[in-house]
Amino acid sequence: MAAKEVKFNSDARDRMLKGVNILADAVKVTLGPKGRNVVIDKSFGAPRITKDGVSVAKEIELSDKFENMGAQMVREVASRTNDEAGDGTTTATVLAQAIVREGLKAVAAGMNPMDLKRGIDVATAKVVEAIKSAARPVNDSSEVAQVGTISANGESFIGQQIAEAMQRVGNEGVITVEENKGMETEVEVVEGMQFDRGYLSPYFVTNADKMIAELEDAYILLHEKKLSSLQPMVPLLESVIQSQKPLLIVAEDVEGEALATLVVNKLRGGLKIAAVKAPGFGDRRKAMLQDIAILTGGQVISEDLGMKLENVTIDMLGRAKKVSINKDNTTIVDGAGEKAEIEARVSQIRQQIEETTSDYDREKLQERVAKLAGGVAVIRVGGMTEIEVKERKDRVDDALNATRAAVQEGIVVGGGVALVQGAKVLEGLSGANSDQDAGIAIIRRALEAPMRQIAENAGVDGAVVAGKVRESSDKAFGFNAQTEEYGDMFKFGVIDPAKVVRTALEDAASVAGLLITTEAMIAEKPEPKAPAGGMPDMGGMGGMM
């Protein structure tokens, strides 16, 4: 086991604070509409340019082990806020730095760290309550656009694109962000249910120019197992031919004789038909087939339920106004399912989302909800260079997370005003002793840190701005750093999601409280470097005359 180095008391805390400051100082330059960029060197490829706090925090690794521990703890604040709210990472980092700095001063003055932490926890809970009660719901898409714009560092175009995407797929819809090959940033919406399985044979194509198979007012057969022979379903196929409607077969696979027979019938013009593989694998495949059945008002033909293909009648099939299939995807639009049943299925999947602990499962379940409830939107981010596209994609991701958070828990005044107003609920609040009172005072002072930083990044004195806002009785009064004027922040369109502000404060106070109560730090001792090798011994050069 390698030797360890141990630091105690103020020596440990000073080294830790130094690490906290290095990381927080690098992150906080990005805060606000006039925040600056940070350039990050990459071991391969071009450097990365970003204004995303968590991206900066994740890149910082210090050579001094004790300083690095402090930095990593604050990095944890940014990561947790990012995971929970998707935005507000820089605000959380600035708050954590302010709480740690003030807290360590109080510890150095002889106060009890545990009582300070209790005071910090009491004050944080009180302010979080105030933020929740001050939140108001998002009323229209212009407010969604404003939230997105603020989070994208003032780029209104990004805010508008996100508002458009949310309007088209609904608040429950899935919105994904991808890099675009071109210059433009655009929104593409896939309505209906789409899954990533294409036609099993190009002979099913009905539109040769676009290489897609389109079926209008189609029947849909959902089969859980492989189809290798069509013999059992001849009566069903005859019923479909009589109805003169096209048929889509979704099965685990359609192979051999069955596929050949379908293709021959299609080419002879007797049967408008297409076949695709069922989406997903294992249990997820069963669940997705059931989703399609509910959406189209059909039944999944499953041997588990004792259903056989020879007994299937035409009324067991699903129906859809339109089915479009290309070589990679199948889209079912306007299924004939009952609205009440679809809503029941959606709430059932939502229940599973709440209960699951796996991020991957949660993401897949959310996709299923979106496909049943609204649709899927893709924001394709463009730019002049690859570096610009990546930087912009970071901001679109942040803005998208912020707007989702706003829809969930409502909005509050932006620009750090919600935190300064929240501090007013701490007036008159006292703890069990004077050290707890000091902890409450630490939070009251720290809550002004984000507003001060936003102002300072805009080249204005932060103390003056914080003082003016603190003295105002108008809860929406604040400083718009973009235009450098004071006034009603709601009218300026400077708003923040309540969830982001709340999460930033909770995570910052949680980690900062742990740092303040640190009394000893242990790290591996660096290995002593081996001395540089000298010239090898030549063994004497005797005998020379």
From Swiss-Prot:
Keyword Nucleotidyltransferase: no
EC numbers on record: 5.6.1.7
Name of protein: Chaperonin GroEL
UniProt cross-references to PROSITE patterns, sorted A to Z: CHAPERONINS_CPN60
Family: Belongs to the chaperonin (HSP60) family.
Functional description taken from the UniProt entry: Together with its co-chaperonin GroES, plays an essential role in assisting protein folding. The GroEL-GroES system forms a nano-cage that allows encapsulation of the non-native substrate proteins and provides a physical environment optimized to promote and accelerate protein folding.
Chain segments carrying region Disordered: 526-545
Top-rank EC class of the record's enzyme: isomerase
Provenance organism: Paracoccus denitrificans
BP terms from Gene Ontology: protein refolding
Known partners and oligomeric status: Forms a cylinder of 14 subunits composed of two heptameric rings stacked back-to-back. Interacts with the co-chaperonin GroES.
Catalysed conversion reaction: ATP + H2O + a folded polypeptide = ADP + phosphate + an unfolded polypeptide
This protein's GO CC annotations: cytoplasm
Keywords: ATP-binding, Chaperone, Cytoplasm, Isomerase, Nucleotide-binding
Subcellular location: Cytoplasm
Keyword Nucleotide-binding included in the entry's annotation: yes
Residues binding ATP, per UniProt: T30, L31, G32, P33, K51, D87, G88, T89, T90, T91, G415, D496
Regions of compositional bias (Gly residues) in chain numbering: 536-545
